[in-house]
Amino acid sequence: MADLLPWWKRAFGRALSIVPKGDFATDEKVRLFRKMVGREKSGVHEEIPPGGDLIEILYTGGTTKSPKGVPINGALFLTQCKYAMESMRPLLTPEENVFMCGVPLFHILGQTLGLGLILSGGTLVLHPRPNLDAIFTCIERFHAKAMIGVPALYRMILEHRRIDQYNLGSVKCWMAAGDALPVEVEKRFRDKFGRTIFQAYGTTETGGGVCMCPVDDENPPPKSIGRCLPGKEIRIVDPITLESVQDGVAGELLVSSKFMVTSYLNKPEETQNAFIDLNGRKWYRTGDIVSRDERGNLFFVDRTVDTIKHKGYRISSSEVESTLQEHPAVIGACVVGVPDRIVGERIKAFVVLKEDVKGITGYDLIRWCRERLTPYKVPQYIEFRDMLPKSKVGKLLKRDLRDEELKRREAT
């Protein structure tokens, strides 16, 4: 993207080693991005190659375990870009779209949506850091039509003190991905802006989007992460037997596609566990527990590694987090299981309060949960934090908090 800078900025940047330099081959197969943008052609659709050479190795976020290299081929990438743009077409054509990208380009979401938009002739506005005033200013300046960000970004927008000073009415399509969107955030956003936040779901291993709420439906079911996108096939199975479950029953999500990733880089054990053969077809085990209704809407329940085992019950940490985040004093929450030799795991919540809130105690939040959750789902411990550990794209790093608790207990 440094090629888009004015010539004098590129020159100074390279002289000061701020702008990266690199060598590349110069033949008929190499296209300079700056010249491609300058052509201003529209309606050009290259055929997707039947196979696909490796074009990049993208690393997972490492929210549950250490990051893993995912080899992505060109056919998968182009297919994902195509369907990502088609998913917004009921509201916007790619050519007229001005897209605010609130996720980085080293993330699969930023690549397939951001670069997919450029390949379709749209306009992409990048924000390396979540500076809300800069984002709002760009929305006004460029009359942005769409924006995507993690759920934490939408909570920050709602809490921003100067939000009423900006006109964000040009945005027709607000999208959230990367984590579960709390119901109270979606409701507050709809009440304030009169717009729906459309949820989407995908992984690095699937090359991006797997499902998305249809943008021509202003009232998607609460907590829905959408319907399966073209080019993808899904199965919801029992995590133990791998037998398909009925609609309405929660199970592990499996994903398959024509040009799918089939292995991790130099990780044979992880590859064997994640990529499996069923009925002669390769499937990726997402490790995410979802359910599906009779209309094909998918609902995120939890990650298998984040399910808390307490007194024989399997408890969704996401459900407890969502309940805590509905409290008017809470801006963020992360729930983990703490090992206990008697009950298996006890429920501990790490909570961040809003800046101007005082006088809220752990007992207040436990009482709040007791009024809204069944007794065995109520946290036993509440710990207040100034912030929660997050990845560079805003995902909660529950692994870090679990490791903290293990070290704390080993030290006692």
Residue spans of the language-model regions?
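ATP-dependent adenylate-forming carboxylate-activation enzymes
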Residues: 1-3, 122-142, 151, 314-320, ...
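Conserved AMP-binding A3 loop
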Residues: 55-82
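Conserved AMP-binding
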Residues: 102-107, 179
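Conserved pre-ATP/AMP-binding loop-to-beta segment of ANL
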Residues: 5, 9-14, 19-59, 66, ...
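Gly/Ser/Thr-rich phosphate-binding loop
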Residues: 119, 144-149, 158-220, 233
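Adenylate-forming AMP-binding core of the ANL superfamily, especially NRPS adenylation
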Residues: 180, 213, 220-266, 274
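AMP-binding/adenylate-forming catalytic core of the ANL superfamily
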Residues: 140, 147, 234, 257, ...
